[in-house]
Amino acid sequence: MSLCDVHCHTERSACAEDVTLEWYVDIARNTDAVFTITDHSAQLYYPPDNRWAFWGDNPREVFDSCRDEGPARIASYIEDVRAVQTGGMLLGIELDIFIDGTVVCDEDRLGDFDLFLGVAHTFPALRAEADVEEVYDQFQTMVGHLAKLNIDALAHPFRPMRGKGYEISDDLIKWLVDIAGEYDFALEINSHSICRDEDIRMAKLAWEMGVELAVGTDSHRKAEFGDFSYHRE
């Protein structure tokens, strides 16, 4: 069974290592692989010399300072990928938002993507390492905003919280599967940074409730691309 990878990075993401758009184009031309280019919207929107600003101390100030240049950079990204798009390569984006729902992208261009992932990479309670109840509450707020944007899938739902040491409750997983079903978006099983227990619980419940799962390698390195061993397991 062939799988569609919904989550692949290029050099336009600051976290990428050896993957490039040119490399993916070569794969698309010479294989039957189906995959989606999904670079971080914040790292496309923010200045090239400050691509980690969204995760920094003053993300809103930097965002406000590039409201003209940011949309232009998003437009350039779309044009660059579309110009070389071929075979089974799709154009997507990994969409960052603020806790108030502000999209870190040109919202008018969201319809220009073949697929877009929503993501709750960071939010105030998580950065402050607040009590778990506050973290859960803000995570639910973030996902609620993303759901209303008609995302196709939610990327690595639990990685940011697990990375800070928070346990993920069955109730939170149930809430997430419920809202995914209500708003008809998929939940990603992500193999770049594995949350095995949470993925198993989420996948079992999604299967029972008829909620779609998405397959993402979240490729930052060439060695990760096309490796679906975790998903098949």
What are these regions (language model features)?
Residues 1-6, 10, 17, 21-22, ...:
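Charged catalytic cores and adjacent phosphate/nucleic-acid-binding surfaces used
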Residues 33, 87, 211:
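Short coil/turn segments at beta-strand junctions that form active-site/ligand-binding loops
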Residues 8, 39-41, 95, 120-121, ...:
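Active-site metal-binding loops of divalent metal-dependent hydrolases
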Residues 23-41:
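Catalytic domains of carbohydrate-active enzymes, especially glycoside hydrolases
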